[in-house]
């Protein structure tokens, strides 16, 4: 059964689009070049003692999490550290420093939005807590608005072909 798009969240996604444009501006990306496409979104309810294992969103350019209710447990963003000379070298450290870490923890609050590259591995930890964590998460794909004269960027779906 194909259903029409649920419009109850339209005001949220319009506000989120403005945040995505600000996010692109933070990196000095020409905002007028891209369409912001919300390709997936889902609600997540995480009960006490539950956690999400390390994963990434391979088909997404930008991923987001909007926290509706949170007991304060961290979201860990994980990246491969370019300073590491060989695999797992930084598992042998004696002290955490800015140049030898591979993770960044964010302790979100209710009504906070976190955006990050979809390829960035992330997870939550199994913290002792009394309350559920409830969030709305999703994936964004950026497509070129008008340009077809560049090797960079994803062409709009109107140029895609299926055979």
Where are these regions (language model features)?
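Conserved double-stranded beta-helix
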Residues: 11-74
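Ligand-binding loop in jelly-roll beta-barrel domains
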Residues: 121, 125-135
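Short, cationic low-complexity segments
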Residues: 88, 156-163
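Conserved small/polar residues in nucleotide/adenosyl-binding loops
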Residues: 1-5
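Catalytic core of non-heme Fe(II) oxygenases with the double-stranded beta-helix
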Residues: 46-115, 132, 142-154
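Hydrophobic, well-ordered secondary-structure segments
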Residues: 12, 16-23, 102, 122, ...
């Amino acid at each position: 059964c194909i259903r029409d798009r649920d419009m109850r969240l339209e005001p949220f996604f319009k506000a989120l689009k403005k945040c995505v444009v600000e996010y692109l501006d933070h990196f000095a990306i020409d905002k007028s070049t891209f369409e912001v496409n919300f390709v997936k979104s889902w609600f997540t309810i995480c009960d006490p003692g539950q956690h999400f294992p390390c994963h990434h969103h391979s088909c997404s350019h930008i991923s987001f999490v909007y926290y509706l209710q949170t007991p304060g447990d961290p979201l860990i963003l994980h990246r491969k550290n370019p300073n590491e000379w060989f695999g797992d070298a930084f598992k042998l450290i004696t002290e955490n420093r800015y140049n030898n870490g591979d993770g960044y923890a964010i302790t979100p609050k209710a009504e906070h939005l976190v955006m990050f590259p979809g390829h960035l591995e992330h997870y939550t930890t199994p913290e002792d807590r009394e309350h559920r964590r409830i969030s709305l998460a999703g994936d964004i794909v950026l497509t070129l608005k008008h340009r077809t004269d560049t090797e960079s960027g994803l062409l709009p779906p109107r140029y895609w072909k299926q055979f």
